């Protein structure tokens, strides 16, 4: 088997994780107590869904996942929620005091005490796998736990499981809405680790997803649950081909191979279509061409950044439901003729498509309508540099005055780390700039490590 272990860190990671496992269970017909009436091979782990669930002899299906937080309240909701019987108590790890939105607390003082316990639990899950293919890591970089403990854990995973791929689903701070004043510091420090220790990072941002909920689902005041269910659909689409047998299956490492032209250029934009509310669904039957066009709309992007301002380097389209390759080819051909969708000159083809015949499932009583077919797009575009330059700008404004820095230094961090991380991000922005420029004159090798100051 090619198993995948999911690691959910901090409030954002745990809440997105909740939404994901809720959806996986519905998709596979697994009950909240872990039993699966439709599973004929009890205790035998050779079904496709066993990449994400392990099975006990009694026929209980247990997610291959760990939930970690430095304070208990959010994970306690899992411990007492609908799916409390699904998880083994050891998979839910909490500390006693939180990281207080401080990267240094998550990475040095408090995170350091809990990280070995986390790694032990992950090791137990890994030992239970026959052919572990990688990790999915869910966190946000604005707070303290997701950024600090997340970075620490990724560093340690690189040491322990060097060759396994690590995909990050990372919530980045939004341009207008902030939950903490020190978000820019935490984000810059954490991205420094994401750059080195993840193979692919999919960037999400709450504001962009709020807008999608408001615009497409007519939810006036979206809650985190609304947001997370939408994120769960994206993640479910990406992992569908690992969990179901399909026509064009896509492996975790395949994302990496097809989307990452240079090791550092691995921050992805994602979008999902169709996002329609149950009321509207009765009147619209969306064709493959329509949902494909909709996935390329700037308004569908799950991070606030406009792909029209950049060029695409590569793009993955994951279809699910009633879709045939012929329609996909036609839709992609149409996209290629559009002037607004530009590819870099050194990547003329740039499309990888996957098709999975399992139609999208929706959470009963949720906001999304049940549809026949859906598509999720992950793209590597130079426009994502907008997200970094926005955060860097905010970082510079605060750091010029050394505002709030004492909280970080007081937790045992050195001030030099700030400037080191900031320089790394400046180099990253420069890399993106170089990758997007015409490459006739060079030999196409720039952008590999260009822009080190």
Curated annotation (Swiss-Prot):
Residues 431-453 have a biased composition (Acidic residues). The active site is at 254. It catalyses: GTP + H2O = GDP + phosphate + H(+). Its main location: cytoplasm. GO terms for molecular function: GTP binding; hydrolase activity; metal ion binding; structural constituent of cytoskeleton. Acetylation of alpha chains at Lys-40 stabilizes microtubules and affects affinity and processivity of microtubule motors. This modification has a role in multiple cellular functions, ranging from cell motility, cell cycle progression or cell differentiation to intracellular trafficking and signaling. Tubulin is the major constituent of microtubules, a cylinder consisting of laterally associated linear protofilaments composed of alpha- and beta-tubulin heterodimers. Microtubules grow by the addition of GTP-tubulin dimers to the microtubule end, where a stabilizing cap forms. Below the cap, tubulin dimers are in GDP-bound state, owing to GTPase activity of alpha-tubulin. It comes from the Eukaryota. Its EC number is 3.6.5.-. SUPFAM superfamilies: Tubulin C-terminal domain-like, Tubulin nucleotide-binding domain-like. Pfam families: Tubulin (PF00091), Tubulin_C (PF03953). The modification N6-acetyllysine is found at residue 40. It is found in: Cytoplasm, Cytoskeleton. InterPro entries: Alpha_tubulin (IPR002452), Tub_FtsZ_C (IPR008280), Tubulin (IPR000217), Tubulin/FtsZ-like_C (IPR037103), Tubulin/FtsZ_2-layer-sand-dom (IPR018316), Tubulin/FtsZ_GTPase_sf (IPR036525), Tubulin_C (IPR023123), Tubulin_CS (IPR017975). Its cofactor is Mg(2+). Belongs to the tubulin family. GO terms for biological process: microtubule-based process. Coiled coil: none annotated. GO terms for cellular component: cytoplasm; microtubule. This is Tubulin alpha-1/2/3 chain. Gene3D superfamilies: Helix hairpin bin, Tubulin/FtsZ, C-terminal domain, Tubulin/FtsZ, GTPase domain. SMART domains: Tubulin (SM00864), Tubulin_C (SM00865). Keywords: Acetylation, Cytoplasm, Cytoskeleton, GTP-binding, Hydrolase, Magnesium, Metal-binding, Microtubule, Nucleotide-binding. Residues 429-453 are annotated as: Disordered. Mg(2+) binds at residue 71. GTP binds at residues 11, 71, 140, 144-145, 179, 206, 228. It comes from Naegleria gruberi.
């Amino acid at each position: 088997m090619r198993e995948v272990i999911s690691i959910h860190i901090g409030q954002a990671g745990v809440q997105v994780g909740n939404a994901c496992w809720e959806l996986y269970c519905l998709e596979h017909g697994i009950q909240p107590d872990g039993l699966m009436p439709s599973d004929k091979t009890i205790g035998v782990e050779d079904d496709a869904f066993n990449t994400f669930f392990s099975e006990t002899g009694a026929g209980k299906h247990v997610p291959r996942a760990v939930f970690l937080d430095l304070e208990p309240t959010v994970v306690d909701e899992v411990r007492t929620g609908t799916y409390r019987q699904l998880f083994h108590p050891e998979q839910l790890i909490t500390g006693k005091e939180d990281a207080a939105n401080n990267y240094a607390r998550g990475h040095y003082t408090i995170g350091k005490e809990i990280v070995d316990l986390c790694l032990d639990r992950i090791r137990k899950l890994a030992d239970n796998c026959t052919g572990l293919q990688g990790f999915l890591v869910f966190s946000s970089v604005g707070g303290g736990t997701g950024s600090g403990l997340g970075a620490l854990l990724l560093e340690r995973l690189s040491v322990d499981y060097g060759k396994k791929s690590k995909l990050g689903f990372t919530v980045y701070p939004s341009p207008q809405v902030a939950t903490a004043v020190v978000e820019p510091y935490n984000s810059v420090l954490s991205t420094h680790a994401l750059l080195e220790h993840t193979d692919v990072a999919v960037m999400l941002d709450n504001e962009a997803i709020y807008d999608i909920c408001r615009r497409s689902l007519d939810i006036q005041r979206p809650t985190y649950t609304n947001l997370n269910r939408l994120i769960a659909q994206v993640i479910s689409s990406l992992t569908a081909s690992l969990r179901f047998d399909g026509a064009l299956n896509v492996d975790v490492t395949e994302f990496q191979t097809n989307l990452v032209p240079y090791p550092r250029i691995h921050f992805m934009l994602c979008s999902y279509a169709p996002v329609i509310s149950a009321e509207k669904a009765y009147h619209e039957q969306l064709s493959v061409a329509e949902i494909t066009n909709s996935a390329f709309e700037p308004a569908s992007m799950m991070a606030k950044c406009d792909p029209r301002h950049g060029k695409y380097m590569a793009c993955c389209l994951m279809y699910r439901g009633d879709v045939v390759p012929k329609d996909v080819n036609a839709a992609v051909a149409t996209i290629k003729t559009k002037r607004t969708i530009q590819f870099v000159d050194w990547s003329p083809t740039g499309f990888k498509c996957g098709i999975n015949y399992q139609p999208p499932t929706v959470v009963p009583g949720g906001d999304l309508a049940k549809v026949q077919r859906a598509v999720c797009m992950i793209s590597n575009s130079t426009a994502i540099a907008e997200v970094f330059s926005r955060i860097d700008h905010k970082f510079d404004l605060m750091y010029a005055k050394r505002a709030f820095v004492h909280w970080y230094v007081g937790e045992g961090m050195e001030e030099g780390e700030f400037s080191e991380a900031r320089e790394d991000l400046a180099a990253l922005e420069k890399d993106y700039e170089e990758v997007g420029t015409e490459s006739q004159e060079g030999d196409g090798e720039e952008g590999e490590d260009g822009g080190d100051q």
